[in-house]
Structures are given as structure tokens and as C-alpha cells.
């Protein structure tokens, strides 16, 4: 029964991630068609959107992966990180209005994939962010002061990831406590019939 509940939860997370993937693509497409948007390589951006859409369609709707797993969700979020990084790189680096899309991945990962995967994804996002920040300055002007400014700008991402991970862990512990309480007899502490179904 617990496996069915876990699979049902993963299916719900997967549906949410599918909506997130399509909304992300629509948002990037809307930014792309805005007359005031700044895109360095328009063909590269169009190609990235087409490849990302093909990935989502093939990964989600080809029925190759019928059973939902956390690693499937993690792989999809890594693809989202690469897509966001490419879009941010093409639209102004760390000054891009699309930079905050990383928060969606951090929050989703923290709520659904656990602390370790969230830490790995946050490390990947951090590397992308600092690469984008470093590539936006001249070689001789990069200094400790500039590194401090980048770190302070990026600190809210760390806080969001950390606090969301803590909240998700607390919710998971509370749910497990409620399951244990509902599966045991209040007076004797032994498992009741519901625990064996």
C-alpha cells in the first residue's frame, strides 16, 4: 500500500513537472517575441527551444518511461537547468530577466527530490550562475569585490533552496508520523488491521 501511495505521489509530481516544463517553454517563447527583448543569437535560441520541446515530448509522451521514479524527475529537472542556462546566456547573462527561472527548479527539486538531489542541482545552478557572471566582466576587472557582489546577489537562491528543503523534510516527517499513528493501536501500540492491508 505504501508503494501505491509513493507511486501516486510521484505521478502527481510528474504531472506538475510536465506543466512546469511547458509553461517554461511558453514563457521563454513570449520573451523571445517581445520587441524589447535582447537575444544574442536568435537562431541559437530557436534551436534551443525546439530541442527542449522535442526532449519534453519524447521523454514525457513516448511511453518509454511508464513508471515514475525520482531519477526520471531529476533528469528532467537537469534538462530544465541546461535549457534555462542557455536562455539566460543568450539573453544577457546574469542581467537577463530570465535568471529567476532557476528558482522554479530549486523549489521543485527541494519539495520533491530530497536534499541530496537538490544539493547537486543547486551546485550545477551555482556553477552556471558564476560562469555567466564571470563571462559578463572583462578579464582584468574581475576582483574579490566583484565576487562578493555576485555571491550576495546569488544568496537568495541558496536561502530559497535551503528553506524549501527544510520545509519538505518537516512535511515528510509529519506525514510519516501520521501514517505510523494511523497504523498502530492507540492503547497497545501494536499494528492494527489497516497496517496489514
In which residue ranges do the predicted regions lie?
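Juxtamembrane or sensor-core-proximal signal-transducing alpha helices
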Residues: 58-62, 152-182
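Hydrophobic transmembrane alpha-helices and their membrane-interface boundaries in multi-pass
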Residues: 16-93, 101-106, 125-127
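Membrane-helix interface "capping/anchor" motifs
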Residues: 65-70, 110-121
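Residue-level signature of transmembrane alpha-helical entry/exit and packing/kink sites
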Residues: 73-77, 99, 145, 149-153
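N-terminal membrane insertion elements
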Residues: 17, 114-166
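Hydrophobic core segments of transmembrane alpha-helices in multi-pass, intramembrane catalytic enzymes
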Residues: 98-106, 153-160
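Conserved nucleotide-binding and Mg2+-coordinating catalytic segments in signaling enzymes
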Residues: 179-197
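Short, Lys/Arg-rich, polar N-terminal cytosolic tail immediately upstream
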Residues: 1-10
